[in-house]
């Protein structure tokens, strides 16, 4: 917005399908866009692509950010819509090879039709800060030496918060002073809070809600826990590594999101919560990667916003 961008609101397509179409068509006809760039977590909704094509938009881009989708209905919609995408777009983008193959197909990827654009970030912004660590811990009422396990993600099936609770329960058994910091919001939040209450760990968990300054909270954490059921290329995992945080993640996450095996442990979702907890303790002992080294690895892996942004020009 500071650079002159504008935000337009249209009805929620799930709640008002025809209202969404009417509003989107009106927007396209009034503004006369040269490019429409659609970020996609699945192919369940390809309506924006179709409407942009019908409106005569010169360049229509579909950008894949996921590698699977939950639910039978969404899977059926994905299967039906994926072959149709090619009729509406000029460009196919993906945040990772896995995400590109999933949405656009192996053949399109191997023919070189898919451009990989990493989920890049501002490296300086996400670097570790001792000042932020101290201030956020004070704000949350956490002692300086307590183990803080953190997670950033929407409360939905994909992020696997139930597994996070099971793992943290094991961590609590061995280190009662440990705290869990969950950043985000979503439809499953109340359900997870109720499960935490039943497990007897609710008072050890901090639910921050949506934060506009996630980078400050990352500095307050000791280990980043990310047992997702599936992912394209998770932005929050890249941010955690930019902060130098040791990470314990599921084996369903693409290796393209791992900057270095030195401070990332990948574990099968089939493994027990005990094994996950042991990995958390081990990574905590390994400690953070230095700020300068984390920034260097980020740039080498292609996650520097200044370099990746050029691909969109």
Stretch-by-stretch model annotation:
Residues 237, 246-250, 256:
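Short hydrophobic beta-strand element within catalytic cores of glycosyltransferases
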Residues 147, 151-173, 187-193:
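A conserved mid-protein helix/loop that constitutes part of the nucleotide-sugar donor-binding site
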Residues 24, 127-142:
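A short helix/loop element that forms part of the nucleotide-sugar donor recognition site in Leloir-type
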Residues 125, 140, 287-313:
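A charged, aromatic-enriched C-terminal amphipathic alpha-helix characteristic of glycosyltransferases
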Residues 188-191, 202-211, 217:
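Active-site donor-binding acidic/aromatic loop of nucleotide-activated sugar
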Residues 41, 210, 229:
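Aromatic "clamp/platform" in nucleotide-sugar-dependent glycosyltransferases that forms part
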Residues 88-129:
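A short, active-site helix/loop in glycosyltransferases that binds the activated sugar's phosphate group
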């Amino acid at each position: 917005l500071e650079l002159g961008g504008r935000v337009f609101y249209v009805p929620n397509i799930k709640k008002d399908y025809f209202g969404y179409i009417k509003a989107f068509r009106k927007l396209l006809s009034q503004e006369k866009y040269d490019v429409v760039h659609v970020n996609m977590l699945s192919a369940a909704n390809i309506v924006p692509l179709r409407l942009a094509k019908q409106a005569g938009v010169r360049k229509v881009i579909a950008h894949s950010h996921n590698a699977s989708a939950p639910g039978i209905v969404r899977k059926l919609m994905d299967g039906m819509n994926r072959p149709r995408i090619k009729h509406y777009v000029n460009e196919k983008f993906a945040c990772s090879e896995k995400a590109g193959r999933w949405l656009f197909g192996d053949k399109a990827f191997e023919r070189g039709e898919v451009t990989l654009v990493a989920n890049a970030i501002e490296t300086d912004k996400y670097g570790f800060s001792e000042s932020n660590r101290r201030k956020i811990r004070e704000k949350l009422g956490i002692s300086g030496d307590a183990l803080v396990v953190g997670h950033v993600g929407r409360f939905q099936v994909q992020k696997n918060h139930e597994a996070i609770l099971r793992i943290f329960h094991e961590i609590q058994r061995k280190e009662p002073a440990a705290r869990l910091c969950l950043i985000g919001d979503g439809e499953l939040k109340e359900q997870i809070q109720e499960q935490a209450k039943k497990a007897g760990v609710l008072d050890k968990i901090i639910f921050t809600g949506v934060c506009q300054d996630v980078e400050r909270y990352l500095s307050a954490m000791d280990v980043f826990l990310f047992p997702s059921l599936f992912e394209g290329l998770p932005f929050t995992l890249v941010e955690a590594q930019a902060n130098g945080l040791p990470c314990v993640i599921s084996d369903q996450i693409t290796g393209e999101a791992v900057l270095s095996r030195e401070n990332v442990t990948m574990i099968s979702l089939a493994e027990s919560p005990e094994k996950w907890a042991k990995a958390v303790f081990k990574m905590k002992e390994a400690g953070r990667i230095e700020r300068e080294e984390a920034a260097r690895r980020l740039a080498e892996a292609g996650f520097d916003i200044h370099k990746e942004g050029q691909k969109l020009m």
